[in-house]
């Protein structure tokens, strides 16, 4: 058995037993019995355009893991985000491009969560994604302002 497969099995046991992804209301696990193919999900960060959403992602590994980054990490839930491909869900983020063998699956999930909370407009997937995501985020900000303004009238008086 390769060290990559052993490492993935260890990480699966750790994720299940430790509950490490509970803080982001998520999980990750192998697809059926294929330890090299994983699905996971996270809940969108609070007070962000992705709040209350459930975001699924997929990861594919080689037996060279963790010495080599996953060969594919992508969002499965359609999303407007400047660092995520609208059509294929490919994610453009530094956690993968700066891969080190100490990185792990939980780290990937946390990096995706952080990317939803703090998009990186300096490194967009492409210019179309950047403009659509900006529009989506502006609409979110307007909805929040309207919501706050409307709720400011509720001061508890009964007429």
Model-derived features: where do they sit?
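Eukaryotic intrinsically disordered and solvent-exposed regulatory patches
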Residues: 24-27, 42-45, 59, 78
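Domain-scale recognition of soluble eukaryotic interaction modules
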Residues: 2-15, 41, 69-159
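N-terminal leader/pro-regions and domain N-caps
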Residues: 1-33
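Conserved, non-catalytic sequence blocks in retroelement Pol enzymes and Pol-derived host proteins
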Residues: 29-32, 46-47, 99-104
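Proline-anchored loop/turn motifs at beta-strand termini and strand-loop-strand connectors
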Residues: 59-70
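A short beta-strand-loop element at or near the start of a globular domain
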Residues: 36-40
């Amino acid at each position: 058995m390769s060290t990559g497969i052993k490492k993935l099995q260890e990480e699966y046991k750790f994720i299940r037993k430790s509950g490490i992804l509970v803080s982001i209301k998520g999980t990750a696990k192998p697809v059926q019995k294929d330890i090299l193919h994983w699905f996971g999900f996270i809940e969108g960060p609070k007070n962000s355009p992705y709040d209350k959403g459930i975001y699924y992602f997929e990861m594919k590994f080689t037996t060279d893991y963790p010495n080599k980054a996953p060969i594919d990490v992508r969002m499965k839930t359609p999303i407007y985000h400047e660092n995520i491909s609208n059509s294929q869900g490919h994610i453009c983020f530094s956690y993968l491009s700066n891969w080190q063998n100490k990185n792990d699956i939980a780290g990937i999930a946390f990096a995706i969560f952080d990317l939803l909370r703090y998009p990186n407009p300096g490194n967009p997937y492409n210019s179309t994604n950047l403009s659509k995501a900006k529009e989506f985020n502006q609409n979110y900000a307007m909805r929040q302002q309207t919501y706050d303004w409307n709720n400011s009238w509720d001061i508890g008086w009964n007429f």
